Amino acid sequence: MLSVKSIPAFNDNYIWLIHNNDNHCVVVDPGDATPVLECIKEHDFILDAILITHHHHDHIGGVPELVRQFPSVNVVGPENEPIPTLTHPVGDGDFVELFDEQFMVLGVPGHTNGHVAYVGDEKLFCGDALFSAGCGRLFEGTAEQMFNSLQKMAALPDETEVYCAHEYTASNLAFALAVEPDNDYLLRYREKVLHLRAHGKSTIPSTLQREKLINPFLRTSEANVKKSVASKVQDSTEVEIFTALRRWKDEF
């Protein structure tokens, strides 16, 4: 099994550093090079690759400096997005070998048109597509694209760990409880999250099993979720339910 370290950046970003027992590492979505370089120096890591999920600056801002410091580093990212110094463009269904583990690339458009996620070693690095108890805003893609992307990720094994790129869990849970105020699991989990955050601790990684219990955007087939948006939809297809939820969340 590979190990993962979180490197906090900006106000609420997480840069993920994946490493093995030989001190080789990969970083995911390095929006800022400084904390990454500090972590690499502290642990005497060797940077092999950078994985990028999408082109937003808080996910790629540190790439040029990391490439300057490590000229031979592989930069892996979505083939149809403007990523600086990209060496390995990838798309849905491609594989990336990291530390003798095969990571599969999932095309998960919605937040951006070319957004990808990486899954391997029972870990999902999903950028701004899936959050704990939430999902990314639709800056470029359509609601139907995002719905399908979330369904694709939800089809992975329940034990898959979810490494999203932002600490949004507490605010997302507030919305989830507006959707499902009688969801006992949600109520209990919110207390745990508030305790963790009060002590400065991360709520990430989550798991897909947990997300299926707390994330309204993965619960569009649930009667209580459908009921919560019944007045906002023309019909009750899951895509329409998702679209109504996403609009509601944008205004929440």
UniProtKB/Swiss-Prot annotation:
Record InterPro entries: Clx_II_MBL, Glyoxalase_II_hydrolase, HAGH_C, Hydroxyacylglutathione_Hdrlase, Metallo-B-lactamas, RibonucZ/Hydroxyglut_hydro
EC annotation from Swiss-Prot or TrEMBL: 3.1.2.6
Zinc listed as a keyword: yes
GO biological process, one term: methylglyoxal catabolic process to D-lactate via S-lactoyl-glutathione
Pathway the protein acts in: Secondary metabolite metabolism; methylglyoxal degradation; (R)-lactate from methylglyoxal: step 2/2
Note on how the cofactor is bound: Binds 2 Zn(2+) ions per subunit.
Pfam family, one: HAGH_C
Catalytic activity: an S-(2-hydroxyacyl)glutathione + H2O = a 2-hydroxy carboxylate + glutathione + H(+)
Record's keyword terms, sorted: Hydrolase, Metal-binding, Zinc
Disulfide bond sites: none
Gene Ontology molecular-function annotations: hydroxyacylglutathione hydrolase activity; metal ion binding
Residues binding Zn(2+) 1: 54, 56, 111, 128
Cofactor: Zn(2+)
Keyword Transmembrane assigned: no
Binding site for Zn(2+) 2: 58-59, 128, 166
Similarity remark: Belongs to the metallo-beta-lactamase superfamily. Glyoxalase II family.
Quaternary structure, from the entry: Monomer.
Free-text function comment from the UniProt entry: Thiolesterase that catalyzes the hydrolysis of S-D-lactoyl-glutathione to form glutathione and D-lactic acid.
Designated name of the protein: Hydroxyacylglutathione hydrolase
Organism: Aliivibrio fischeri (strain MJ11) (Vibrio fischeri)
Gene: gloB
